[in-house]
Amino acid sequence: MSWFRWDGDDLILECHLQPAARSDDFCGLHGDRLKIRLTAPPVEGKANAYLMGFLAKAFGVSKSQVSLLSGELNRQKRVRIGAPKKLPDLPGLCRP
């Protein structure tokens, strides 16, 4: 299983989130998921909201084009990015 797949023009990411980190960044793979470190704390949905903004900026879309499909209360998350305008330099990530 890959950490990403395309669904039409949308990108689906399988992520492993590390909240309350020292920096915000993509830091490679964690098993079959993309590991993302965020400075936001894991309380009251703050890390999830911060993740949406982080991904929107990284993929060149608005926050409304990023949605959490699963993993609201878990570090393992599935996220949909609607028609990304740019692709960050991540292992194996390319357009279909």
From Swiss-Prot:
This is UPF0235 protein Pfl01_5322. SUPFAM superfamilies: YggU-like. It holds the Pfam family DUF167. InterPro entries: DUF167, YggU-like_sf. It comes from the Bacteria. GO terms for cellular component: cytoplasm. Belongs to the UPF0235 family.
